[in-house]
């Protein structure tokens, strides 16, 4: 029989423990939310989409399906875009049966949307396995696989204009349309309020994007200011472009080192061992698909993406003539919107939840990857294969890129955001889109004048 005093003391301790659980749980939830928002860097722009869009199947169904079947269900049906996978066999059938090129192009373009989302999901899964530094590089490599593959096929078929337009369109879409929509819809949810904004990752991305714009402008200006002959001028422009590509790559990987290694504490909270929910999610994912399986699926998805990208590149001009839409408009406006639909939707959803820092990570991170990683890699590949390519994106395209980066920089210059800032970015994108649509008449007018 315990003394009354000890029993009273025991009950008092139990009550204090129960009372203390609620504040500690609230603090833990708040820290988890901050950690999720702070974990975004430009090197991991595509990972959050894959993390948030998970399989809706129950654990019981997964156990009943078994190993390979469970992986098939997880990878193909684990996204809300899974109905669009039906466009993949339709594209193959349209190509095999020699149907209209418009159908091949349309089905291929639609099929790229779920493939891009699944590639992001698989690369994020692998990145979580190999560690933060290697994972950041992995996400940087796989985050824009569709754009990279389309660019490589355009390079192989010597369609330089389509190559440059598709890459430019991805940058413009992320900076103006997606970021603008995120600020717009997130601001409407918080109408009448100014929300705080973390500028640290935005400053890094904007600095890299401005460096990329400088390289493009330098190449453009050098082509028109040189007094030497055409062949000498072309050689000088090519040398300048290749030098700039090397500088851009060094700067990009330097930014990765800055964010993932030397100054990592600035961009994300310190990891602790209390991340129980994350470890539970990881355990669930590992029980369905492991590292080796994820690599196999990633390679398979990349192969299918390459096939559809080949269809898009080979049919885009004929589809343009059939639809009466300029190739430049399709390459700059339509391709990026459809190809990155899942990633774009994720950015807007996070803005709805007042997680604008994650939206910044998605949009600015993807734009930075295209500008400072994909573009110079494509140029170096063309250099190795003796294919002439430079950083001159033409006057209108370079001007649009410069204005997009400058407009975004001014929009994010303070630590507040509201819907009007998003509205300005969206309107800027609409003006550029209309410009590329109506400019189709200029070549015809010039020929008639001659």
From Swiss-Prot:
It is found in: Vacuole membrane. Residues 95-101, 156-170, 223-239, 309-331, 382-385, 446-450 are extracellular. One of its GO terms (molecular function) is calcium:proton antiporter activity. Residues 28-52 are annotated as: Disordered. Its main location: membrane. Expressed in leaf blades. Vacuolar cation/proton exchanger (CAX). Translocates Ca(2+) and other metal ions into vacuoles using the proton gradient formed by H(+)-ATPase and H(+)-pyrophosphatase. This is Vacuolar cation/proton exchanger 1c.
